[in-house]
From Swiss-Prot:
Protein name as annotated: Photosystem II CP43 reaction center protein
Name of the gene this protein is made from: psbC
Cystine pairings recorded for this chain: none
Source organism of the structure: Cyanophora paradoxa
GO biological process: photosynthetic electron transport in photosystem II
Keyword Transmembrane helix: yes
Amino acid sequence: METLFNSSVAVSGRDQQSTGFAWWSGNARLINLSGKLLGAHVAHAGLIVFWTGAMTLFEVAHFIPEKPMYEQGLILLPHLATLGWGVGPGGEVIDVYPYFVVGVLHLVSSAVLGFGGLYHAIIGPEVLEESFPFFGYDWKDKNKMTTIIGIHLILLGSGALLLVLKAMFFGGVYDTWAPGGGDVRVISNPTLNPTVIFSYITKSPWGGDGWIVSVDNMEDIIGGHIWLAFICIIGGVWHILTKPFSWARRALVWSGEAYLSYSLAALALMGFIANCFVWFNNTAYPSEFFGPTGPEASQAQAFTFLVRDQRLGANVGSAQGPTGLGKYLMRSPSGEIIFGGETMRFWDTRAPWLEPLRGANGLDLTKIKYDIQPWQERRAAEYMTHAPLGSLNSVGGVATEINSVNYVSPRSWLSTSHFVLGFFLFIGHLWHAGRARAASGGFEKGLDRENEPVLSMKLLD
């Protein structure tokens, strides 16, 4: 029988008297108990992985193959589909068994993490330094903190490499730009040119430039992950082998709450970037799985009505609309031929179903007359009625002319949730950064519990 590190499983060291924090402060009570804090983190990871596995199985159980993913309120299966599992040409789901396997693997993993969390929270050593010096730490030990940063960076780089390996050697990934409407393909020639990869970072975030969100091919996405993996792993090794420079020792606040604030800022930034990526990008987030982007749905409506009226005999190249501009086609500010009407504001939209109809100077009139394929018509008609707002238009941010019923786009859900979560994470960063700086400066005040206003208020009854 194993000898317990703690002879008692009582909550000593976790009450207000011994830690200075009440129960509602959560893990703040464990600031100086590295073993118990490890248990809290491992258990938290178990909860996250459990949700992932359970929700994946829930989506598999409710999945209807005849309907597109974005019409079924799915947010996990679309991510698995982008990795090339269970899908074929055009994004058609041909096998849900891989999704079932992923869900079960996550459930099993969550059980292991859950037991690990309980072990470290109840049975394991309260302080790691005494029993396992390598895993122990002191918040003010700058060298140990940068070593921990290095380990995290190596893990992040390894995660980026996993996507690279899947795309290049283990079956490929789904590419919405594959000819004929998208397909799973192996990315055998990723972009490694640093000029191409790092030019995304220097792009303007406004208009058609779109910063890193403008990436529109899988070669650049996988090449970017190769560069990220290289930078993260090299950076991780650097931080493990070196000590912080003197300027970093002076400039940064070295405390547990400071590290929490740094982490929250990083997560907030990721949330804001993910928000933009999900909303605008249809390469990393293919419209076959996540639904069309707003501009894409608007262009799809113009295209659908152009196809209809052209079959009815309209001369789409010269027909005028009520404003005197082209009804179906017009010129962009840079002289390209674009769709007319209200969708003119989205003239620089790029979509796999539309690009084959472009020529050297925008939309090619000859291709529009003779080369439109049935799959393009079907996809545009589907996207037209599945705009991420539930509508093609909005006035002052309020959706108007609703043209879909009982529909919430995964694109709307994911972008909104990531923005909201990113916002609150940023507020958390400001809060904890302020507290950490105040504590470091020696002027942290906190709340005066003895003179709280609530103590002088009348009872509710």
